[in-house]
């Protein structure tokens, strides 16, 4: 049963302190709750901004593409060629195959080494149509035939700079040919050339099994011309 007696001054003063303490604690908890809510609000806002930034970047990436280019300079000749990033979709299997055979043919025909000349000679004959093969064989019967002109003392090295398949059985191959003494003495002499080549596949001719292994598709050069690149000293 409640005590009906009035509170003494000491009791009233004590109750005031207790109520003040309760109010202060409640105020502190309220401020903490408010601070926590503000912190969560800021965190969610920052997360939203980050998400929007990522979406914007992902949307803009397809619109801006950086394509690296590398300029390769041939030391001996100074010839420059652009090396681009390889993209498989930029080439068809037919284009790659044509470039392969074009570069193989030109390299074998234009280089010279006394120790491998017979191999290159046979290979060029194998990849040449009858008329081109006849002209090539005739060049080795002339007084200035490569084997008579250079003998064992000189080599001609070939570096392919580019190969372009123009379609319809025509391609061009740009290359550097460097002449050196076989013993490594003396200065090297380099020059740039462009070979224009007409070609076809599976020409009607008899090939042995060994020849078919070397030329399985019957690649044959039907016309061949090589010119020095203009503008050289």
Curated annotation (Swiss-Prot):
Keywords: Cell inner membrane, Cell membrane, Membrane, Transmembrane, Transmembrane helix, Transport. It is found in: Cell inner membrane. It comes from the Bacteria. This is Type IV secretion system protein PtlE. Belongs to the virB8 family. Pfam families: VirB8 (PF04335). The keyword Cell membrane applies. Its main location: membrane. One of its GO terms (cellular component) is plasma membrane. The chain crosses the membrane at residues 42-62. GO terms for biological process: protein secretion by the type IV secretion system. It is a single-pass membrane protein. InterPro entries: NTF2-like_dom_sf, VirB8, VirB8/PtlE. Changing residue 10 to A: Strong reduction of PTX secretion. Even stronger reduction of PTX secretion. The gene is ptlE. Gene3D superfamilies: VirB8 protein. Induction: Cotranscribed with ptxABCDE. Activated by the two-component regulatory system BvgS/BvgA. Component of the type IV secretion system ptl required for secretion of assembled pertussis toxin (PTX) through the outer membrane. Could possess peptidoglycanase activity.
